[in-house]
From Swiss-Prot:
Its biological purpose: Kappa-casein stabilizes micelle formation, preventing casein precipitation in milk.
The keyword rRNA-binding is assigned to this record: no
Keywords (A to Z) from UniProt: Glycoprotein, Milk protein, Phosphoprotein, Secreted, Signal
Annotated site (Cleavage): F118, L119
GO CC annotations, alphabetized: extracellular region
Sites of Phosphoserine modification: S162, S178
Source species: Mus musculus (Mouse)
Modified residues (Phosphothreonine): T123
Signal peptide positions on this chain: 1-21
Subcellular location: Secreted
Glycosylation, residue list: T134, T144, T155, S162
Listed name of the protein: Kappa-casein
């Protein structure tokens, strides 16, 4: 995939200048005359090739460029005189203070870090007797009664009153067998 991408980019890089030249001069093939490009001489600045090649931007920068300025010009410059004075002085006395680390320390009493629960280590006691739940295949299946509601429509014919259908719910128990194994 990456190789194909690099090949396509290289082909485009090689063909784009020719395509751009054809687009800028679309009817160059139609004319039989010579195309003379006239530059505005006031706008074109003459830059000798020697000065362009000697320019620092085109050279590899293997070391930092240090301008020759007086010592008071930059506070960040390396001064050999100061280093010589530091090397020639007597060594500093060994400090009685304990050297502090770079990171901040807790001010309180150190506490024990508890082991996380997901790193449960098995003990020797649990290896002898492994707990496997026993399932008896001969256990009878117990049916559990589940009450259900069914609506029964009773039509009562009363000669004294109008005929009205009465809905009365009636409960029945249906045995449901559970297949838990």
């Amino acid at each position: 995939m990456m190789r194909n991408f690099i090949v396509v980019v290289n082909i485009l890089a090689l063909t784009l200048p020719f395509l751009a030249a054809e687009i800028q001069n679309p009817d160059s093939n139609c004319r039989g005359e010579k195309n003379d490009i006239v530059y505005d001489e006031q706008r074109v600045l003459y830059t000798p090739v020697r000065s362009v090649l000697n320019f620092n931007q085109y050279e590899p920068n293997y070391y930092h460029y240090r301008p020759s300025l007086p010592a008071t010009a930059s506070p960040y410059m390396y001064y050999p005189l100061v280093v010589r004075l530091l090397l020639l002085r007597s060594p500093a006395p060994i400090s009685k203070w304990q050297s502090m680390p770079n990171f901040p320390q807790s001010a309180g009493v150190p506490y024990a870090i508890p082991n996380p629960s997901f790193l449960a280590m098995p003990t020797n006691e649990n290896q002898d007797n492994t707990a496997i739940p026993t399932i008896d295949p001969i256990t009878p299946i117990v049916s559990t009664p589940v009450p259900t509601m069914e609506s029964i429509v009773n039509t009562v014919a009363n000669p004294e009153a109008s005929t009205v259908s009465i809905n009365t719910p009636e409960t029945t128990t249906v045995p449901v067998s559970s297949t838990a194994a």
